[in-house]
Amino acid sequence: MNDELQTMDTTTIVSIKKRKPKKLPEDVLIVESSLENVKDENVKTENVNPEIVKPEKIILTEDLGKKFEMAICMLYGIEYDGKYKYSMEEAEKIKDRLTNLQNVFAHKLKHTAKNGSQYDFTGEEDETIKLSAKTTKKDGKVCPQVIGQPSKKKFCEFFNVDINFTLEQIKEYIEANVDKMLNIYFDLTFDCPILYYNQKKDVLQLVKLTNINGEHQKINWTEIVIEFSHKKKNKSWTESSTISINNVTIGEFQIHNNRDCIKFRWAFENLLKIFPNTFEVINL
């Protein structure tokens, strides 16, 4: 990092050229502001406010999901399970948006999302009742429960992949077994009703699998042609590759070289549109 020092009369102005930050994942934004110690015999620093010089680090995590869960708790008049350190005012606004939910999901619930639980809400009297809360700020991408963004170790254990596989070998495994993996991702995502909220579009939907004669409709992924974006472009898979059906994106795999995470996210709204007979969607 290069420092530029400019002196104007008795006032010393220190400006720092900041490196352009690397693009971070959507769900984590790190904002850092710091002023490095400047050592120059011509620059006086004894009168500089120490609060300005002291490095600060502010971490803004993906909080929409937590606010959404709090809003549901407020709507149903139940306790939020865990620590909540986000805006109650914004949660209240979301609660007002959820008004019609109780008309279509009239169950007594308890909040059960703590510690990465598979279900965000469970029936208080009937524990077979489950509800998953899914949010997106704008792009419509959501992760499956449990295995949506695991470490390499957890991914390998879950899919019975050799832990010694390199990331390139894991990519090859995904390409060769994508239909089987989508079956698993699908089952973990839609094993209970989903309350989906797209903040930018103001889309609020209760989504569940269509039930015909007591059986939930599913998708036979083995009969569907799935295309990877990097293959369509005749390029190698670097970090991200989307999967599509008839040129419509339905999901995305992300494998970063410098992060211990093998991530999959559904293009949720596209998935609902491509398979309309598979889902029952109630717009709220």
Task: Give, region by region, the residue ranges found by the protein language model.
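Ala/Thr-enriched low-complexity intrinsically disordered regions
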Residues: 7-12, 45
